[in-house]
Amino acid sequence: MRHSLTKLLAASGSNSPTRSESPEPAATCSLPSDLTRAAAGEEETAAAGSPGRKQQFGDEGELEAGRGSRGGVAVRAPSPEEMEEEAIASLPGEETEDMDFLSGLELADLLDPRQPDWHLDPGLSSPGPLSSSGGGSDSGGLWRGDDDDEAAAAEMQRFSDLLQRLLNGIGGCSSSSDSGSAEKRRRKSPGGGGGGGSGNDNNQAATKSPRKAAAAAARLNRLKKKEYVMGLESRVRGLAAENQELRAENRELGKRVQALQEESRYLRAVLANETGLARLLSRLSGVGLRLTTSLFRDSPAGDHDYALPVGKQKQDLLEEDDSAGGVCLHVDKDKVSVEFCSACARKASSSLKM
């Protein structure tokens, strides 16, 4: 009701010019007698409905009563200074009334305005949204309508949203500070003892174990490759030495094959000249010469027999008086040749000593 009266006074003051704005005398407005009576009745009703407001609105009631008694007397509109003083004087009563109103409420009721469960004392009147049909004091029902109910509900909704955001902000700050402190503790004590610390260590070990396994496998592969390469190198060195030996043996075998080919050609020629050699040898035997040969004897180590592998020939130191002086008689078909051959001479002398 106080707000409604303030609005009426402000409207009347805006319609009438003040003394400071114009030098003319203040305009007079004659209020009807029925309007003054209604205002006085409303004052009395408000005083009876809310006893806490009797003292605050006593002066206003007297002012309205004086206006009603004078009737057509000129009424001066309140100045802005008087309105401010009146608003300041009314603040303590509103604060105590708001505190009385909030004393019977819980936090959950404030946070859920759509389903209110407010249990107020019988003597307290709620300054919340009131409908014109009923609820609250009679003065509130007279002066407030559906628009005021919707505005009050919107204000209460905003108030509950603000409280919810404040609570969420406090909870978020506390949770973030707790998480930050826990993270700092874990960083300061990496091996520190706690359930979370041990779980973190287990997670770190689980993430590091595949890396360690991969590094160990790579190192093992490198060692295996190195060992394999070293084995190949040693095998190559051994095969190179063996190859050299085989090459030397191949050369020796090549020489032996060549000697065998020459000997085979020589023996084929002897067999081809068998008849002439047989007649010559028969005549020599008739002359009284003894025929000898080294064909059926084992050749000595220094023999140059081409059918046998050639070894290191040892030079036999022969005495001067034992030196052989024989000659080689070569019969080739119809031709007979005498050759001087030391090897044949040694064979001949060795056969004579038998």
UniProtKB/Swiss-Prot annotation:
Modified residues (Phosphoserine): 50
Cellular localization per UniProt: Nucleus
Gene Ontology biological-process entries: ATF6-mediated unfolded protein response; integrated stress response signaling; negative regulation of DNA-templated transcription; negative regulation of gene expression, epigenetic; positive regulation of transcription by RNA polymerase II; regulation of DNA-binding transcription factor activity; regulation of transcription by RNA polymerase II; response to virus
Region (Basic motif), start-end ranges: 219-226
Bias-annotated ranges (Low complexity): 121-132, 205-214
GO molecular function, one term: DNA-binding transcription factor activity, RNA polymerase II-specific
A GO cellular component annotation in the UniProt record: nucleoplasm
Residue ranges annotated for the bZIP domain, each copy included: 204-267
Motif mapping: HCFC1-binding motif (HBM): 303-306
Gly residues bias spans: 133-143, 190-199
Family that this chain belongs to: Belongs to the bZIP family. ATF subfamily.
Function: Strongly activates transcription when bound to HCFC1. Suppresses the expression of HSV proteins in cells infected with the virus in a HCFC1-dependent manner. Also suppresses the HCFC1-dependent transcriptional activation by CREB3 and reduces the amount of CREB3 in the cell. Able to down-regulate expression of some cellular genes in CREBZF-expressing cells.
Self-association state and partner proteins as the record states: Interacts with HCFC1; the interaction inhibits CREB3 transcriptional activity. Interacts with CREB3; the interaction occurs only in combination with HCFC1.
Annotated protein name in UniProt: CREB/ATF bZIP transcription factor
Organism: Homo sapiens (Human)
Encoding gene, per UniProt annotation: CREBZF
